Amino acid sequence: MLSRLFLRHSNLRFVTLVSSKSNSQIFSSFIRPLSTNSSGGGGNGDGNGRNRNDVPWSFTGVNDDKSGPFSSDDSFGSSGVAGSGLPGGEGKWPEEPKRWNIKEEEEKVVFDTGGEVGQGIETSRERRGNEWEETKRWDMKEGEEKVVFGGGGDEVDGFGIRGEVKSNEWDVSKPWNLKEEEEGVVFDTGGEVPFSFENSLEMAEEERVKKELIEKEEKELLEVIKGPDRAFGDLIAKSGITDEMLDSLIALKDFQGVEGLPPLTEIENLRREKSSKKSSRAEIELQMQEDIAKARVRQVDETGRAYGTGRRKCSIARVWIQPGEGKFQVNEKEFDVYFPMLDHRAALLRPLAETKTLGRWDIKCTVKGGGTTGQVGAIQLGISRALQNWEPDMRTSLRAAGFLTRDSRVVERKKPGKAKARKSFQWVKR
């Protein structure tokens, strides 16, 4: 369809119709019943026995012999081309034209200027005489090497190949190089000194330094003119007196003339005495520490034995220790006989192992009440306290190990309505 928009030479108008393939007769016979002729195919005297209205698609610009791009007065059109529809032809109307295809249009001449092939643009086909020959398609690389604008010569309007101008004899321009550009003058101003970026940075730095010096001098002058905020301000700051303290003194000075208030000197003296005087609680604590220090001396009876009492649950133990060969008796029995379990015997000897005096003491104790576990705990606490009374320096190690702490855990009492202290009876719903 686009081919109708371009102008063609008169001698090439019917070439397209001749070279195009003829449509099949099946299509034309299929369209024939659509004719509006009521004569049923009768002749009209043009020699082919067919009416003009039998043409299924009768376009004014294509089939009309008086107007359109195919109407012409030259000898070629009147010579009688088959299918032209003119009186000088064979009397047959042109068959249905083939649909437009972009691939076929690209193979044809896009711009037809009077029958000559456009210069500078290669087409897929070129007419030479009466034969059609295949030509090479246009290549971008080869097109760059050829003349872009021009007919058949090497020069067109003074421009040569590769953009050189030969009429004015200009030299081919060299590609831009950064190294050569840095060595030369970037902006040639007729002998003037070129503008340097480094010089501008140095000037900006100098201006900044000058500005800082001016601001510093102004600040020093303002400090000298205004002076400190308060008289002897530096001395007050160094002495540690804060603004809150000064405000409190000023407030007390304001109440100096009020009746019923003591003078300011008496108030200051009372405050000074209260701060320097020791409190009664501190005195009590100091007295207790002195008493404890006096009590940390060896405490032995008339026989030279240290005594200690221990309690655990319901058991009460009384322990006497003295330097000896390592004998250990519980209720007039050897402790390994009284406590057959190895864990109980090891628990009794732990205070001695902690003080590193195992085997250096003769221990005699009596215990009553409670069970085996309670009696073991009571004897252990009694031994620890007896060691402390014999040698007060052992208190630190025994205290750190926890042997001087009384275990206050006892059996919890039974509650009413329960089987034991916390155990409940079996609950029955009904």
Swiss-Prot record:
It comes from Arabidopsis thaliana. PROSITE patterns: RIBOSOMAL_S9. The gene is RPS9M. Mitochondrial ribosomal protein required for central cell maturation. May work together with PIA2 in controlling female gametophyte development, possibly by regulating the expression of some mitochondrial proteins. The keyword Ribosomal protein applies. InterPro entries: Ribosomal_Su5_D2-typ_SF, Ribosomal_uS9, Ribosomal_uS9_bac/plastid, Ribosomal_uS9_CS, Ribsml_uS5_D2-typ_fold_subgr. Belongs to the universal ribosomal protein uS9 family. Expressed in root tips, young leaves, flowers and siliques. Residues 32-97 are annotated as: Disordered. The lineage of its organism: Eukaryota, Viridiplantae, Streptophyta, Embryophyta, Tracheophyta. Interacts (via C terminus) with PIA2. Component of the mitochondrial ribosome small subunit. Its main location: mitochondrion. Residues 68-79 have a biased composition (Low complexity). This is Small ribosomal subunit protein uS9m. Residues 39-48, 80-91 have a biased composition (Gly residues). Residues 1-34 form a transit peptide. It comes from the Eukaryota.
